[in-house]
Regions:
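C-terminal nucleotide
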Residues: 1-137
Length: 137
């Protein structure tokens, strides 16, 4: 992914636009966390994720991480949002979708993805505790 981002930095015509908007996205995300506004956090997270993938796709050579299954997962997220579930996604340099949701939606998300895609396993995690120092070196 470092190599891919270096290719994007050098060749994508929209790389600088993505950098320019990143500080705005970071500030919006920080504000939404302070406000405990999951919808607002989801909107900016998804927007930044999509922009990053557009940067990679417009690189030479084009870098495409998303697969058909990735897109199927995004369709499921959209459908669940339309049905009133509070969730959003992000995807880093790879095809794996990370879905952030309230705990009351996690099982239906898992059920929908497993029944509608070829995904065999979902890793379910929870928010950890506060930051702590584990090694001073």
């Amino acid at each position: 992914s470092r190599e891919g981002m270096e290719i994007s930095r050098k060749t994508s015509p929209i790389y600088q636009n993505w950098l320019d908007i990143n500080l705005e996205h970071i500030n919006e995300a920080a504000e939404s966390i302070k406000e405990k506004d999951m919808g607002k956090l989801g909107k900016v997270t998804e927007e930044n994720c999509k922009f990053m993938h557009e940067v990679m796709e417009t690189s030479i050579p084009s870098i495409v991480y998303m697969t058909g299954i990735t897109n199927s997962c995004l369709d499921i997220v959209k459908d669940l949002k339309a049905r009133g579930h509070e969730l959003f996604y992000t995807i880093d340099a790879g095809p794996q979708v990370k879905i952030i949701c309230n705990s009351n939606s996690s099982q239906i998300i898992k059920d929908e993805i497993l029944s509608k895609t070829k995904i065999k396993e979902i890793i379910h995690t929870k928010v950890g505790g506060p930051p702590s120092l584990i090694n001073e070196n």
